[in-house]
Amino acid sequence: MSRIIINADDCGYSQKVNSHIEAAIKQERISSTTIMANMDDFEGAIRLYNEHCSHISFGFHMNMTEGSPLTYSQELLDLGFFKEVEGKIVLNGNPYRRKVLSKSARQAIYSEVLTQAHKIMDSGVQFSHIDSHHFMHQAVFMIPMLPKLCKELGVAKVRNYRNYMPNGLNKSIRTLWAKMIRTQNSKIIFPDVFVDYQYFYECYAKGIIYHKEDDCIELMCHPGGIYTEEEALLMNTDCEEKFNCKLINYNEL
């Protein structure tokens, strides 16, 4: 029987997002969520952790693409990774995900990510795993940094690359990413499969199966966000009954 983790991204993004995540927790529709350090309702995310950490997992949602950074770097401003908008410095990492950056730029980015993590940990959160906003933990410049971050934070579990697809070149390339990370830190654990909730739901409904019977599958969702159709499916579906699986969290992986 497959094991499924349903992770709600963006905990802390806003009061609306947090309220929808809390509803999904209470209805047992998700088993995990990941916290952002620099968005509008960080305090609400910490409240959710304190109230629900006994039965779902809480990870670190590193953010390099939205909101204000927690550190200052003139180099990242000059590069454009940090950007000034209407007198406010904001994160702008998305255009750089496939670029090779200088050592000093990577160090400045690492400092920002570490500061985000420590802000959450200093509020009493014990991370179950690491993922990221807009998949930035999969950026080229993060490949040498992610194993180091895992070691420094004492976290061994990381979201996999989106790999729910037929076997072929594209899937092989995505599998290579995980192998490159493991080469640098053999203790890192990934779920076998990662895909968004709605795509998995629709494939399953059509009998399209790309996973093995004993795989651990992470399904990503965004309660309170723009994906209202996906959220409706999530909130009206008993995962274990629908997908013939066991619902687990990252602490059980």
Which residues make up each language-model segment?
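DG-centered beta-turn motif at the end of beta-strands
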Residues: 8-12
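Terminal accessory/targeting
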Residues: 2-5, 15-124, 129, 137-253
